[in-house]
Amino acid sequence: MEVTSFILNATFKEFACFGNNYLIILPGIMLERNVFRHLNYSTNSICSHYQFFGGHYESFELLVVIVYYFSHVGSFSLAEIYRITWDKRIVLYGTTTTLVYCSEGSD
């Protein structure tokens, strides 16, 4: 599970700007098993609303972020974002091959 730890450590700040209630489902963990790590994190990020796949996501929405990690250290080749609806359905919002980080400054 070294890779899992690395991903959590490397992406905590970057994902923080996506809001207060987000789930990151790491490689090898299946959505159907309902096993995930719940991040509840507030930030003073420059992001007040979130743009992904050309869409806008309000901060109160609950999203599931599935990140596929490929060998290149620190790089993410694919991400999928799902939304958990009020009636507990899971809706795919889209996929991206470039996970855009939204962090605060300093290269």
Curated annotation (Swiss-Prot):
Topological category with respect to the lipid bilayer: Single-pass membrane protein
Membrane-crossing residue ranges in chain numbering: 62-79
Keywords, ordered alphabetically: Membrane, Nucleus, Transmembrane, Transmembrane helix
Primary localization: nucleus
Compartments where found: Nucleus membrane
Cellular component, GO annotation: cytosol; nuclear membrane; nucleus
Name of the protein in question: Uncharacterized protein C16E8.18
Classification of source organism: Eukaryota, Fungi, Dikarya, Ascomycota, Taphrinomycotina
